[in-house]
Amino acid sequence: MSTKSMIRDVELAEEVLSEKAGGPQGSRSCLCLSLFSFLLVAGATTLFCLLHFGVIGPQREEQSPGGPSINSPLVQTLRSSSQASSNKPVAHVVADINSPGQLRWWDSYANALMANGVKLEDNQLVVPADGLYLIYSQVLFRGQGCPSTPLFLTHTISRIAVSYQTKVNILSAIKSPCHRETPEWAEAKPWYEPIYQGGVFQLEKGDRLSAEINLPDYLDYAESGQVYFGIIAL
């Protein structure tokens, strides 16, 4: 029986009883019947809505909370992309804190990573395959006071391509932490100067990449994760 039929039957019953009822007793009977009719109609309407919107009834396709079906094309595509990216070359090397006075990269410390063909040779990362790569590096300089001569800090990422065997700067930055000399009578205050660089480049198999600075004596090794160099195949 449909919801419309149920409502119509209730209305007919009210009309019949209204004609038969009379006096106070009849009024009370009509009031009870009206209340019962309202509850019946409300229940039928609620049941119809639950069935219509699929809250009850046949189970829907399994879904992840707040997301698409686990068998949807979108999820399958993301899974395939994740599996493919796990086979791409990647490297993340950190500064060797046991080599004062020079910037030496190391791939054996904690949080360092070399995967899928990337090599560290002669302080350079060797690209294992053609493709687009994200190249990034950060250094942190630290000093105490400012000298009488200008102080310039440089950070350069260079590429030696297999096709022309010439060292070319592909990312470069320069900073000066000191704008004036610290007076002899003044307290020499510490300063910190970070430099971060990153970019996407088309590289060839066998290309060599280096990250260098001009004043390694100012490098800050106080905390891990402050000086690093890496590449990620895209």
Swiss-Prot record:
SMART domains: TNF
Record-level GO BP terms: extrinsic apoptotic signaling pathway via death domain receptors; immune response; necroptotic signaling pathway; negative regulation of feeding behavior; negative regulation of lactation; negative regulation of protein-containing complex disassembly; positive regulation of apoptotic process; positive regulation of canonical NF-kappaB signal transduction
GO molecular function, one term: tumor necrosis factor receptor binding
Spans within the Extracellular topological domain: 57-234
Modified residues (Phosphoserine): S2
Membrane topology: Single-pass type II membrane protein
Site (Cleavage): S34, L35, L39, L40, C49, L50, L51, H52, T77, L78
Protein name: Tumor necrosis factor
Gene this chain is encoded by: TNF
